[in-house]
């Protein structure tokens, strides 16, 4: 992790809920393990929840890892804004590129999911991140996601 000094104090779900618009069961991340101005590392066990809001037909498909990647971006944006004394600008996911899924489903995985997301490009009204999601060291999904930002409230 590069950029601003690394923040290594673990951040729990309660703090994540203060930073993002995703609330209740739709908040997919449980903890931030490390972050800096350019990147973030997170982990979660939410994929094992039988009541997961994205489940369909009693399965949680790997396609939903794109939402995990997008929410990693939101958590990172919230942390960056809070570190600057402000609030994150609301964003809307507008594109996914180069997404590769290496499994079909994730609800059967027993350990935590881990994600690393990194800012690739950003401007005043948009951001693009790369994300990689792993389980026990095995790559599950990777890709890029772009968001358009609205002015912060």
Kindly give the residue locations of the regions a language model identified:
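Conserved positions in beta-strands of structured domains
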Residues: 17, 33, 102, 116-120, ...
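HotDog/MaoC-like acyl-thioester-processing domains
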Residues: 2-9, 75, 107-111, 116-153
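Hydrophobic beta-strand-centered segment that forms part of the acyl-chain substrate-binding groove
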Residues: 75-116
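Compact, glycine-rich, soluble single-domain proteins
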Residues: 57-76, 91
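A generic structural motif
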Residues: 33-36, 100, 121-123, 149
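Catalytic strand-loop segment that frames the active site of acyl-thioester-processing enzymes
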Residues: 23-61
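Short aromatic-glycine motifs in intrinsically disordered, low-complexity regions
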Residues: 11-23, 87
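Small-residue-enriched segments and motifs
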Residues: 27-30, 94, 115-117, 143
């Amino acid at each position: 992790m590069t950029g601003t000094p690394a923040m290594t104090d673990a951040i729990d779900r309660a703090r994540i809920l203060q930073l993002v618009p995703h609330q209740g069961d739709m908040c997919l991340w449980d903890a931030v393990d490390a972050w800096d101005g350019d990147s973030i590392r997170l982990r979660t066990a939410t994929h094992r929840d039988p009541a997961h809001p994205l489940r369909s037909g009693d399965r949680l498909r790997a396609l939903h890892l794109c939402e995990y990647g997008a929410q990693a971006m939101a958590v990172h944006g919230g942390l960056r804004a809070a570190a600057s004394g402000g609030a994150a600008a609301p964003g809307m996911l507008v594109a996914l590129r180069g997404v590769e899924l290496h499994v079909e489903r994730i609800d059967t995985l027993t350990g935590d999911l881990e994600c690393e997301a990194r800012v690739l490009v950003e401007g005043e009204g948009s951001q693009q991140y790369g994300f990689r999601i792993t389980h026990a060291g095995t790559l599950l999904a990777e890709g890029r996601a772009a968001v358009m930002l609205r002015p912060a409230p």
